[in-house]
C-alpha cells in the first residue's frame, strides 16, 4: 500500500515524482514521462529496487521488461548489470546479487517480438507450426502474398456465374488490371492482423453495411459526421461574430450589422438541428437562405475593415455551402441505399480476404516460416482461449506466466498496438487496482501510427487512472525536463499550449503535460528560440511543383549553412556537461531535422559548398549505381533476352562496347523483331568487311549469353553472378574506375543479396529479379552504410523519427512550410480500425460514382488523426534541442500567409480556434499564429497587444521572429574590393598588383629550384622487369629478333576485345599452374587436369584460361633434367616476392645525379630450389620461339640470354642478400620447345 512505500533518502537526486515512479506498488501504474525526464533511469532504478528489496527481493528473471527496440533492451540489461555491480562493491558477500548477475543474461528483457518468440519456442506443440521455423524476409513475404493472391483470383475468374465477384471486379478495377482489387485485399488483410481477432474485425465491416430495418440515425458514420457538422457550423459562427465585432468599430460598416445578426440566427437554427438528428439538419439545410447585403457607400467607412467583414461572411457561407454539397445534397434514405447496395460486394471482398489469409498462412506453414505479425498472433493463441460467451480469456499457459512474473514493465507504452496490449493483458493480473503492470511512455511522442501503434491505449488509461490510484490504476507525471534550457522548454510550451487540445490533437496540453525546467545551465548569449520564415517571391519559383520544392530546399539550406558557419566562426558557446564549462560550438553539436529525407541531398550540397562537413543516412541510390544497373540488365537479359531495353543497355555498356553507330547498324539489319532476334540473324550471316569488328563483339557476347542461360538453369544464382563477374572481367574493370573500391563493394552487395535470396523459400533468376523489383516498388533502396562515432565532427541531417530519443545542443527544424502528406486520404478506398471500410459508390452500369457516408466519415477521422500525429511529430522535433532551437520554413507569399496567420491573433483563449488548428496544411500554420500572439513578434508586426490576453502576450519565453527575403539568399556573395582588383588585372592580362614587402618573397618562391632535379626524372621504386627493359633500350637490343619474341600489346579490357586470351594472359595462367601444382602427387595429365579444375573452382583461374593451358608442356618440364631436380630438391619455394635497395647507377645507366642515391627494387622469383650443394633459381618463360628463327634455338639463345641476364642477376642478388647464401646457378626455362638456358655473369 501507499503508506508502506520507502521514503526518499535525504539528498536524493530523484524528484518526488521520479521517486514515486521508482517505489509505487500494488496496482497498475502508468508513468507519463515527458521528453528528457529521465524515464530510462527511473525504469532501471525501479528494477534494481525490486531485485535488492530487503523484505521481498525479486529475482530478475521474474520480471518481464518489454522495450521498443533490441538496442534499448541491450542498453537496459547493461544498465541493470552496472547497477548490480555497484551494489556488489558495497556488499561483496551478497550471494543474492551475484545470483541476479548470473540470471541477467536469460532474463526476459526484450522486445515484444522476442518475448513472443520465447513463448512460441516453449509451447510450439500447441500450434500447427514446425518448431524449426524461421522469420520470413519482408520481400519474400510480399512475393508469397502475390503468389497466393494470383492463384485465388485466377480461380475466381474461372468460376461460372460468379456474379458478385464480377460486380466487385467491375466496381474496383480498371480496364487494364485488377491491381486495385489486389491492393484492397492486401490492405484489409494487413489491417485485420492489427486486431486480436482478425476475423471478428472483418465480420464487423460487413455488419456495418447491413442496414436492413435501420435509419440513418442508427449509423455510426452519421453520428460521427454530425459532430463534424457542429464543428463546421461553430467555425462559421466564429467568422460571423468576428465580422460583427469589426462592423461595430467606429469606422466599421455599421449597416452590415443587421444582416450579420440574421446570419447568426440562421447558423443558430442549423446548430440546433445538428444537436437533434441527421434528418433535422437535412431539412434545415434545404431552407437555408442568406440575406442580401445592403448597399453602402464604401468611402464612408474604412475600406480595409469592410473587406475583412465581407471576407469573413463569405468564409461562413462557404462552410455551410460545403456541408450542403458534401452531406446534405442527398436525402438520408439515399445514403442507406448505398450501404444496402454495397453490402453483398463487401461481403464477397471480406470472403476473399479470409480465403487469402487462410492460404497465406498455410503456405508459410509449408515453408516453415513466420512473419512478425504471426509471432504476435501465435503468442496470443497460446496465451488465450475462448470462453463460453465467445470472448477471449487467459489460457493455462497464460496463468503460468502470471504466476511467474512478479511485475511486467513496458517501455514506450504509447507505441503499443491492440494485439500487443492483449498479450500483455494475459500475462498480468486482471485487476488494475491490484495489478502488477508498470507502463512508461509519453503519448505526446507517439509517432508510429503508420506502424499501427495505438496511442488511444495510453490515453484511455491516462484519463481513467488517478494520481492517488484509488479504485483503479495510478498515473504519475514526470514533467521535469533535464535536457534543455529554459528558452527551449518555454518556447515549446508556448506553441503547444496553443495548438494541442483534446478535440484537435487528441491530448490536452494542460499544466500536467507542460515541460518543466529540470536542468541548470550557465548564462548564455543568443539562446532565444528563433522562427525564420523565408519569402519565396513569384519570380524565383521554378516552373513545376518539383522544381519549386528543390528551390525551397536550396533556400533553407543556404540560410542554415550561413547560420552554422557564422556560429562556428564567431565561437558561439555551448555547455559541456563533462567539463562543467562553456566551450565553442563544433559541427557535431548541430543537427538538421526533416519530416522526410527528399531535401537532404540539396541541403548536403549547400553545406559542403560552404565547407561544412555534413552526413545524412540517405539509404538510397544503390540500385541507381551504374555498375549495379548494368549488371541487373545483364541478368534481365539472361532471364529473357527478348527484352529490348535491357539488351540494348548491355550492348551499349563497356561489357560489349557497342557505340551508337554500331547499335544503329545492328538495328538496320532487321527493323522488325526484337534486338535479340536481329542479333541472332546477324550472326548467322557472313559479315561485310566493315562490320567484322561488330560481328566479333556480338559473337563473343552471344556465346557467353548462351552459356550463362544454360548455367542459370542448372546452378545457383550466386554462382551465376560470380561467373558473370569473372567471364566479363567487369568486376575488375569497375575497380579501375574512380571510386573503384566502392563500385566493387556494390557488386559484392548484389552477390550477397542473391545469397540472402537463396536462403528464402524462392529459387531462380526470374524470382530474384521480381524480388528486387518488389524492393524498389516499396522504396527500400539501399545506400552506402557508414558508421558514425559520436565524436565525429559533422553536421547531421536526419528525420524527426530517427532523432527520437536523441539530443543535440543546436537544433534546426527545417521544411516547416512543406505540406502534410495527405495521400492516404486520396485513395479509392479507406480503412479505419473503428469505422472499417469506406469507398466511393460506383455503378459500372450507369457509369457514375459518388462519395458515400462511410467514406466521408473515415476521411474526416483519418484527417483528424493525421493532424494529431503531425502535432506529436513536431513536439518530438522541438524537444530534441538542448540549448538553441531554430525553426525554418519557406512560403510562396509571406504577406498573404501572414494575413491568414493573423486571423486568430486576438483570440481570447490559450487554445487557438479549432478551425485554425484543424485546417493547418503545414507546421508553419501552427507555429506562426502561435508566435504572432507573443510580444517578441512585435519587431516584425508592429501591431501592439490589442486584445491578446496578458498571460499569452507576455508569456515568459524568448523568440526571434524574422521574415527572410529569398532574393538575398540566392544572390551571389559580393566580391571584396581587393579581390576585385586582382580579377580585373587578370582579365586585362596586366601585372597583378602585389604589396611591396612581399615582392622579394614571391620572386624567391617562383625562381626556386629543387636540389635533386635528376632524381625527379627517375622513379624511386622500380620493378625488375622495368629495369630489364631500361637496359635493353640502352643497349639497343630492341631489334628485329627481340620484336619477334614480343607478344602484341593490348591495352583494352578483355571484355572489350574481340575474343581469346592475350599472350600475357596465357603466360599468367601457366605461371599460376606452376605456382600451385602439387609436387607431392604424380605429374600426369589426369592429376594436372584435376588440379586445374580445382583452381577454377577457387577462382585462381578463369574457365577460359584453364582451356588454354597446354598440360603436356607442363609435364614436359617435369620430365626434363631441370624438372626432375625440382622434384628431388630439399626444398622448393615458388612465387617468392622480394624488395631490396639498389644503387641508382646500377638501375639506371643514364644516371647523372648524386652518387650514393638508392632506389627500391621489387620483383617476384618464379622458383627457387635448395639442393645439397647450393641454391638454384629458375625463371619460367612462355615466349614463342619455335619457327621464329631460321637458325632455330641456337640462334635465339644468345639473344634470350642477353635479354634476361639483368633480370636474373637482380633476382640472384636479392636472394643472396636475404638468405646470406650464394646462388650457384641461374636458369631460364622456355616451355615452347622445352629449352633450358643457364645464365652466366
Curated annotation (Swiss-Prot):
A GO CC term assigned to this protein in UniProt: cytosol
Annotated GO biological process: double-strand break repair via homologous recombination
Matching Pfam families: PDDEXK_1, UvrD-helicase, UvrD_C
Record keywords, A-Z: ATP-binding, DNA damage, DNA repair, DNA-binding, Exonuclease, Helicase, Hydrolase, Isomerase, Nuclease, Nucleotide-binding
SUPFAM superfamilies with a match to the protein in the record: P-loop containing nucleoside triphosphate hydrolases, Restriction endonuclease-like
Residue span, UvrD-like helicase ATP-binding domain: 12-485
Entry superkingdom: Bacteria
Domain UvrD-like helicase C-terminal: 505-805
Cofactor(s) needed: Mg(2+)
Enzyme Commission number, as recorded: 3.1.-.-, 5.6.2.4
A molecular-function term among this protein's GO annotations: double-stranded DNA binding
Amino acids binding ATP: 33-40
Function, in words: The heterodimer acts as both an ATP-dependent DNA helicase and an ATP-dependent, dual-direction single-stranded exonuclease. Recognizes the chi site generating a DNA molecule suitable for the initiation of homologous recombination. The AddA nuclease domain is required for chi fragment generation; this subunit has the helicase and 3' -> 5' nuclease activities.
Protein family according to the UniProt entry: Belongs to the helicase family. AddA subfamily.
Subunit structure: Heterodimer of AddA and AddB/RexB.
Protein name per the record: ATP-dependent helicase/nuclease subunit A
Native species: Bacillus thuringiensis (strain Al Hakam)
Amino acid at each position: 500500500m501507499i503508506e508502506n512505500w520507502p521514503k526518499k533518502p535525504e539528498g536524493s537526486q530523484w524528484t518526488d515524482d521520479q521517486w514515486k515512479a521508482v517505489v509505487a506498488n500494488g496496482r497498475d501504474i502508468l508513468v507519463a514521462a515527458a521528453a528528457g525526464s529521465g524515464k530510462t533511469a527511473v525504469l532501471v532504478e525501479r528494477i534494481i529496487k525490486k531485485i535488492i528489496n530487503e523484505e521481498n527481493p525479486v529475482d530478475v528473471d521474474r520480471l518481464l521488461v518489454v522495450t521498443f527496440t533490441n538496442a534499448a533492451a541491450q542498453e537496459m540489461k547493461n544498465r541493470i548489470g552496472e547497477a548490480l555491480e555497484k551494489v556488489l562493491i558495497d556488499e561483496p558477500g551478497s550471494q543474492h546479487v551475484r545470483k541476479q548477475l548470473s540470471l541477467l543474461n536469460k532474463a526476459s528483457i526484450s522486445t515484444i517480438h522476442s518475448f513472443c518468440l520465447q513463448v512460441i519456442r516453449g509451447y510450439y506443440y500447441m500450434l500447427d507450426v514446425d518448431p524449426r521455423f524461421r522469420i520470413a524476409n519482408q520481400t519474400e513475404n510480399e512475393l508469397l502474398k502475390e503468389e497466393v493472391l494470383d492463384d485465388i483470383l485466377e480461380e475466381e475468374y474461372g468460376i461460372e456465374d460468379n456474379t458478385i465477384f464480377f460486380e466487385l471486379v467491375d466496381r474496383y478495377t480498371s480496364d487494364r488490371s485488377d491491381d486495385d482489387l489486389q491492393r484492397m485485399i492486401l490492405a484489409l488483410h494487413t489491417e485485420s492482423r492489427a486486431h486480436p481477432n482478425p476475423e471478428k474485425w472483418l465480420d464487423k465491416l460487413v455488419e456495418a453495411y447491413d442496414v436492413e430495418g435501420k435509419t440513418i440515425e442508427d449509423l455510426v458514420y452519421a453520428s460521427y459526421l454530425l459532430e463534424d457538422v457542429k464543428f463546421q457550423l461553430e467555425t462559421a459562427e466564429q467568422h460571423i461574430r468576428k465580422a460583427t465585432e469589426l462592423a461595430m468599430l467606429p469606422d466599421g460598416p455599421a449597416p452590415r450589422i443587421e444582416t450579420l445578426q440574421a446570419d447568426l440566427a440562421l447558423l443558430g437554427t442549423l446548430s440546433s438541428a445538428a444537436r437533434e438528428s441527421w434528418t433535422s439538419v437535412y431539412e434545415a439545410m434545404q431552407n437555408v437562405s442568406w440575406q442580401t447585403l445592403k448597399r453602402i457607400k464604401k468611402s464612408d467607412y474604412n475600406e480595409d475593415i469592410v473587406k475583412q467583414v465581407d471576407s469573413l461572411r463569405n468564409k461562413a457561407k462557404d462552410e455551410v455551402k460545403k456541408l450542403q454539397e458534401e452531406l446534405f445534397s442527398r436525402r438520408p434514405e439515399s445514403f442507406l441505399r448505398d450501404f444496402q447496395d454495397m453490402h453483398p460486394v463487401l461481403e464477397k471482398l471480406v470472403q476473399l480476404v479470409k480465403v487469402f489469409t487462410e492460404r497465406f498462412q498455410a503456405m508459410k506453414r509449408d515453408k516453415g516460416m513466420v512473419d512478425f505479425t504471426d509471432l504476435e498472433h501465435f503468442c496470443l493463441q497460446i496465451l488465450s482461449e475462448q470462453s463460453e460467451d465467445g470472448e477471449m480469456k487467459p489460457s493455462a499457459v497464460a496463468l503460468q506466466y502470471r504466476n511467474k512474473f512478479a511485475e511486467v514493465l513496458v517501455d514506450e507504452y504509447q507505441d503499443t498496438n491492440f494485439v500487443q496490449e492483449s498479450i500483455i493483458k494475459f500475462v498480468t493480473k486482471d485487476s488494475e487496482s491490484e495489478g502488477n503492470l508498470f507502463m512508461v511512455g509519453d503519448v505526446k511522442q507517439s509517432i508510429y501510427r503508420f506502424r499501427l501503434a495505438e496511442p488511444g491505449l495510453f490515453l484511455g488509461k491516462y484519463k481513467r487512472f488517478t494520481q492517488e490510484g484509488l479504485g483503479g490504476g495510478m498515473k504519475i507525471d514526470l514533467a521535469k525536463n533535464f535536457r534543455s534550457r529554459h528558452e527551449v522548454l518555454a518556447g515549446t510550451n508556448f506553441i503547444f499550449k496553443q495548438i494541442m487540445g483534446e478535440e484537435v490533437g487528441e491530448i490536452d496540453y494542460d499544466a500536467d503535460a507542460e515541460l518543466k525546467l529540470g536542468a541548470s545551465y550557465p548564462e548564455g548569449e543568443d539562446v532565444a528560440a528563433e522562427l525564420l520564415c523565408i519569402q519565396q517571391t513569384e519570380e524565383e519559383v521554378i516552373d513545376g511543383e518539383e522544381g519549386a520544392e528543390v528551390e525551397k530546399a536550396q533556400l533553407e539550406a543556404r540560410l542554415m549553412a550561413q547560420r552554422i558557419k557564422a556560429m562556428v566562426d564567431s565561437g558561439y558557446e555551448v555547455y559541456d556537461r563533462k567539463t562543467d564549462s562553456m566551450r565553442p560550438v563544433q559541427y557535431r553539436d548541430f543537427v538538421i531535422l526533416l519530416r522526410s529525407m527528399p531535401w537532404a541531398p540539396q541541403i548536403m550540397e549547400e553545406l559542403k559548398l560552404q565547407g561544412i562537413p555534413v552526413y545524412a543516412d540517405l539509404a538510397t541510390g544503390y540500385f541507381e549505381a551504374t555498375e549495379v544497373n548494368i549488371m541487373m540488365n545483364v541478368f534481365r537479359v539472361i532471364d529473357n533476352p527478348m527484352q529490348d531495353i535491357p539488351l540494348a543497355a548491355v550492348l551499349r555498356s563497356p561489357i560489349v562496347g557497342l557505340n551508337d553507330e554500331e547499335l544503329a547498324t545492328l538495328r538496320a539489319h532487321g527493323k522488325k523483331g526484337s534486338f535479340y532476334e536481329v542479333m541472332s540473324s546477324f550472326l548467322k550471316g557472313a559479315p561485310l568487311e566493315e562490320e567484322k569488328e561488330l560481328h566479333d563483339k556480338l559473337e563473343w557476347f552471344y556465346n557467353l549469353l548462351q552459356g550463362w542461360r544454360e548455367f542459370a538453369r542448372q546452378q545457383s544464382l550466386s554462382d551465376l553472378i560470380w561467373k558473370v563477374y569473372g567471364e566479363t572481367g567487369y568486376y575488375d574493370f569497375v575497380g579501375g574506375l574512380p571510386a573503384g573500391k566502392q563500385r566493387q563493394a556494390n557488386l559484392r552487395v548484389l552477390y550477397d543479396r542473391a545469397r540472402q535470396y537463396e536462403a528464402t523459400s524462392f529459387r531462380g533468376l526470374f524470382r530474384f529479379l521480381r524480388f528486387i523489383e518488389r524492393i524498389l516498388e516499396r522504396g527500400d533502396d539501399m545506400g552506402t552504410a557508414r558508421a558514425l562515432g559520436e565524436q565525429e565532427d559533422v553536421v547531421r541531417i536526419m528525420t524527426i523519427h530517427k532523432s527520437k530519443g536523441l539530443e543535440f545542443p543546436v537544433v534546426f527544424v527545417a521544411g516547416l512550410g512543406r505540406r502534410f502528406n495527405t495521400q492516404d486520404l486520396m485513395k479509392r478506398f479507406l480503412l479505419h480500425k473503428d469505422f472499417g471500410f469506406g469507398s466511393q459508390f460506383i455503378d459500372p452500369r450507369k457509369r457514375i460514382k459518388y462519395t458515400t457516408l462511410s467514406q466521408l466519415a473515415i476521411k474526416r477521422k483519418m484527417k483528424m488523426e493525421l493532424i494529431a500525429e503531425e502535432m506529436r511529430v513536431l513536439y518530438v522535433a522541438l524537444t530534441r534541442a538542448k540549448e538553441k532551437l531554430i525553426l525554418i520554413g519557406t512560403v510562396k507569399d509571406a504577406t498573404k500567409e501572414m494575413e491568414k496567420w493573423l486571423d486568430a491573433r486576438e483570440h481570447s483563449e490559450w487554445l487557438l480556434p479549432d478551425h485554425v488548428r484543424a485546417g493547418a496544411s503545414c507546421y508553419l500554420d501552427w507555429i506562426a499564429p502561435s508566435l504572432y500572439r507573443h510580444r517578441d513578434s512585435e519587431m516584425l508586426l508592429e501591431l501592439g497587444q490589442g486584445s491578446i490576453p496578458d498571460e499569452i502576450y507576455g508569456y515568459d519565453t524568448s523568440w526571434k521572429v524574422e521574415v527572410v527575403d529569398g532574393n538575398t539568399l540566392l544572390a551571389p556573395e559580393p566580391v571584396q574590393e581587393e579581390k576585385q582588383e586582382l580579377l580585373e588585372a587578370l582579365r586585362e592580362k596586366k601585372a597583378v598588383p602585389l604589396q611591396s614587402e612581399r615582392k622579394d618573397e614571391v620572386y624567391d618562391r617562383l625562381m626556386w629550384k629543387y636540389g635533386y632535379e635528376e632524381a625527379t626524372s627517375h622513379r624511386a621504386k622500380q620493378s625488375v622487369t622495368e629495369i630489364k627493359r631500361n637496359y635493353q633500350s640502352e643497349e639497343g637490343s630492341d631489334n628485329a629478333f627481340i620484336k619477334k619474341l614480343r607478344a602484341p600489346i593490348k591495352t583494352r579490357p578483355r571484355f572489350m576485345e574481340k575474343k581469346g586470351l592475350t599472350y600475357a594472359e596465357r603466360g599468367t595462367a601457366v605461371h599460376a599452374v606452376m605456382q600451385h601444382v602439387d609436387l607431392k602427387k604424380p605429374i600426369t595429365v589426369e592429376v594436372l587436369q584435376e588440379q586445374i579444375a580445382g583452381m577454377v573452382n577457387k577462382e585462381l583461374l578463369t574457365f577460359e584460361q584453364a582451356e588454354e593451358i597446354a598440360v603436356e608442356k607442363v609435364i614436359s618440364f617435369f620430365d626434363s633434367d631441370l624438372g626432375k631436380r625440382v622434384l628431388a630438391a630439399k626444398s622448393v619455394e615458388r612465387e617468392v616476392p622480394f624488395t631490396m635497395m639498389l644503387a641508382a647507377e646500377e638501375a639506371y645507366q643514364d644516371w647523372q645525379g648524386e652518387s650514393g642515391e638508392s632506389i627500391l627494387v621489387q620483383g617476384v622469383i618464379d622458383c627457387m630450389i635448395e639442393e645439397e650443394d647450393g641454391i638454384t633459381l629458375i625463371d619460367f618463360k612462355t615466349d614463342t620461339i619455335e619457327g621464329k628463327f631460321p637458325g632455330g634455338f641456337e640462334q635465339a639463345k644468345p639473344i634470350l640470354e642477353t635479354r634476361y641476364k639483368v633480370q636474373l642477376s637482380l633476382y640472384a642478388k636479392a636472394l643472396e642478400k636475404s638468405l646470406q647464401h650464394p646462388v650457384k646457378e641461374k636458369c631460364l626455362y622456355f616451355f615452347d620447345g622445352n629449352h633450358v638456358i643457364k645464365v652466366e655473369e
